[in-house]
């Protein structure tokens, strides 16, 4: 009898799905109907796969609840009591990692201080925090706003902030920051934190630059819509740019690959001729005594062989360019204005278990989470179901894959998006919800991957 009921349910479910998909309604209208059905007919539809997925999404996937963590010596908890949720990982004590299997480099956003241009475009006192603080949930189970932990709503012009960032990064196994560098035909924006970092030799964490060579627009996406400040790409600008940043390339802390300073470009396809730009930069650096440079680009909008641009490598930049599964119809909007898109973050874990071997030099990238509601409000892009445990698995897989593909330690790089992209919910810095869980997951991933690599190296049959 039970089998008969289950078969009947399955048949009804399949038929209902077919009718549902054929309804001539817009997605928002269909979502309202589905929400009403789930709310009013729970006893009838509670067994359905759609309803079960909804419940799972609302409950979240935080696997760190109840876990114990060990963290580096010399740090003390600074999260106020009573402000963190039950999944918050405290800051305990443990020895710092040695002999790390790969170098982890975090993208670093410098927009946490005021500049005249932002004051004019967005209002007096604007920083990244201006968008982060008022962010609100857009659907059931949506976590907003994101509230910082021990570092607070910091100002990057405060030297103590960068010192603490460096301490945290080093203690949890991060090998370097990749600063976004904003250059518009000789006009530099948001460069005060980078200048301060360069001038303060006590900040001993290695660093490199990524030229964010897009236009700035009011949409926060680099597209040509209501441009605030535009790029001025030309041969003269190529030379002016490399001349200016040479002061960073010369610094002893600057990240190098086989002795070559590492320079990233966010979108080389926006250059009139990326190959010609690369040639100019390489020639200029040779003639000025810097020597050879290592050029890489982020796969933010494209996935092509870097040699097409005259570059040496590409860097994965999730969640961009990832074609994840869309689960927008599985969430329950909290207001009628919600027109965003929701994706399932867990797809990255699954894909990382069996990476495709690239045909060119590619550095893996991971992101702890992603949600740009702070910038786009009801038109945001949200990746649901991220968790510290899931991030740990993804990062571990990325490190293991990197060690298999690169024998030279200099090329064993994994990029993390990001250290402090708070308006995109992509950060490792401690917050009130998870505490130090993402930082601790980073350290655990390094430790787990080191053990995996050692085991495979000791067993020749596992080598590829």
Enumerate the predicted regions with their spans:
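Membrane-proximal basic amphipathic "stem/tether" segments
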Residues: 1-81, 92
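Glycan-processing catalytic domains of CAZymes
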Residues: 60-464
């Amino acid at each position: 009898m039970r089998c008969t009921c289950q078969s009947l349910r399955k048949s009804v479910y399949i038929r209902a799905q077919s009718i549902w998909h054929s309804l001539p309604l817009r997605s928002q209208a269909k979502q309202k109907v589905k929400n009403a059905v789930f709310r009013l007919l729970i006893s009838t539809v509670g067994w359905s796969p759609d309803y079960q997925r909804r419940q799972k999404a609302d409950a979240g996937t935080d696997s760190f609840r109840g876990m114990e963590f060990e963290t580096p010596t010399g740090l003390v908890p600074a999260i106020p009591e009573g402000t963190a949720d039950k999944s918050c990982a405290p800051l305990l004590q443990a020895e710092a990692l040695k002999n790390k299997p790969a170098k982890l480099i975090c993208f670093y956003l410098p927009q946490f201080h005021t500049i005249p241009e932002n004051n004019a475009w967005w209002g007096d006192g604007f920083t990244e925090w201006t968008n982060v603080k008022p962010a609100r949930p857009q659907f059931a189970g949506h976590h907003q706003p994101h509230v910082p932990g021990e570092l607070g709503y910091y100002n990057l012009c405060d030297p103590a902030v960068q010192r603490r960032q460096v301490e945290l990064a080093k203690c949890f196994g991060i090998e370097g920051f990749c600063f976004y560098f904003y250059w518009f035909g000789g006009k530099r924006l948001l460069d005060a934190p980078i200048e301060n970092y360069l001038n303060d030799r006590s900040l001993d964490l290695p660093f490199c630059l990524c030229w964010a060579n897009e236009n700035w627009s009011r949409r926060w996406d680099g597209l040509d819509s209501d441009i605030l400040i535009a790029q001025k790409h030309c041969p003269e600008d190529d030379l002016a740019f490399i001349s200016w940043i040479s002061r960073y390339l010369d610094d002893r802390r600057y990240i190098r690959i086989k002795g070559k300073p590492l320079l990233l470009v966010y979108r080389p396809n926006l250059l009139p001729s990326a190959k010609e730009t690369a040639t100019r930069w390489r020639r200029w650096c040779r003639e000025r005594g810097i020597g050879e440079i290592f050029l890489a680009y982020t796969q933010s909008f494209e996935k092509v062989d870097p040699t097409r641009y005259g570059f040496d490598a590409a860097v994965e930049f999730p969640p961009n360019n990832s074609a994840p599964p869309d689960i927008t119809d599985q969430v329950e909007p909290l207001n009628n204005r919600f027109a965003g898109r929701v994706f399932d973050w867990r797809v990255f874990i699954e894909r990382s278990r069996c990476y495709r071997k690239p045909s060119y030099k590619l550095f893996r990238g991971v992101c702890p989470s992603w949600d740009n509601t702070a910038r786009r409000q009801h038109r945001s892009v949200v990746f649901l179901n991220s968790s510290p445990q899931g991030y740990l698995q993804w990062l571990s897989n990325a490190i293991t894959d990197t060690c298999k593909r690169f024998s030279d330690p200099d090329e064993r790089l994994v990029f993390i998006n990001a250290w402090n992209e708070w308006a995109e919910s992509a950060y490792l810095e401690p917050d009130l919800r998870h505490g130090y869980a993402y930082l601790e997951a980073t350290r655990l991933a390094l430790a787990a991957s080191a053990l995996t690599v050692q085991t495979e190296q000791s067993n020749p049959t596992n080598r590829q």
